[in-house]
Amino acid sequence: MLNKDNYILNSLSDLDLSPTMEKNARDKYIALCKYLSEKGLDSDFQPQGSFLIGTTIKPYRDGKNQDYDLDVLAILKRNKDETNAERVKNDVGDLIKESGIYSDKLKKEDSNCWTLEYAEVSNGIGFSLDVVPAVDEIDDIKNVIILSGVDISKVKKTVAITEKKGYL
């Protein structure tokens, strides 16, 4: 019975993002944030989705393990009223494209993010970072959200992300 339990526990632990892989991914987006800052684009990066809440699982498609798909927000430090989605997205993308380090990792452009693909990190598995450019949401919108009953601590973290129509 112990062997079956160990097998199940090992199988489950293989599904999760390992601490080594998580640290590697965090190091990568911190380095990208630093690069953007050095190029004059002041931003903060933070994990998003399953990467944020620690529920990332290894993808499995067509009978094969796939690379992890991790999402991070690139929150530009600028007023939403003074920019637009196209500019926010392209300011990040243009710097990625001109970098010798990041341009080689850039996959095809998505409508609201830039995807950087990293080679094998551990046991034949790598990951990609979906970098989602965003700006802080304006106070008027935040106030409407608060009035709808959402907890203020959550509203303070509200950002506006780029989307297909080119509006924030």
Where are these regions (language model features)?
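Conserved catalytic core of two-metal-ion nucleotidyltransferases
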Residues: 36-39, 86-153, 160-167
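Short, flexible loop/turn elements at secondary-structure junctions
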Residues: 49-52, 74-80, 118-122, 133-135
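Phosphate-binding glycine-rich loops and adjacent basic patches that engage nucleotide phosphates
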Residues: 49-60, 149-163
